[in-house]
Design a protein with these regions (language model features):
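HIT superfamily nucleotide-processing domains
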Residues: 1-145
């Protein structure tokens, strides 16, 4: 489900559609200090409300609502940043042993920021009492272990 109130409102100097009210579009314009890595089509930033230390968001530069609106080139660019950030995070914190990677697409799935972003959540031994099943437990009583 997309919301028509979240249409692109401007074109940035780089030519990317951006929504001036969007926090992720704003990071490209006025808060670049939060960007830890970028390529032509996407950027990485540490989550402002991290689930675990070094929780990272991979974000397309173009204002697009969710993963299903991405172009193939944007998917590739975001994938490249995800792989690069894994190397960086692993080097920054040797206690990281695994990752959860995912996106919320639509209000019912929990999306609350209407600009596509991929969560990259580093995991460490003992950070959750029963991690078995991972994302299968996004609906707690439905996941099988």
């Amino acid at each position: 489900m997309t919301n028509s109130n979240h249409k692109a409102e401007s074109i940035s100097p780089a030519g990317y559609e951006q929504n001036l009210a969007c926090i992720f579009c704003d990071a490209l314009i006025s808060d670049r200090s939060r960007i830890v890595q970028e390529n032509e089509l996407a950027y990485a930033t540490r989550d402002a409300f991290p689930v675990t230390p070094l929780h990272t968001l991979i974000i397309p530069k173009r204002h697009v609502i969710d993963y299903f609106g991405l172009t193939t080139d944007e998917v590739v660019a975001m994938h490249e940043l995800t792989l690069a950030q894994k190397i960086i995070i692993d080097a920054l914190d040797s206690t990281v042993q695994a990752y959860n990677i995912g996106a919320n697409c639509g209000e019912i799935a929990g999306q609350s920021v209407w600009h596509c972003h991929i969560h990259m959540i580093p995991r460490r031994a003992g950070d959750a009492p029963h991690p078995k099943g991972g994302v299968r437990h996004v609906i707690p009583w439905k996941g099988r272990v």
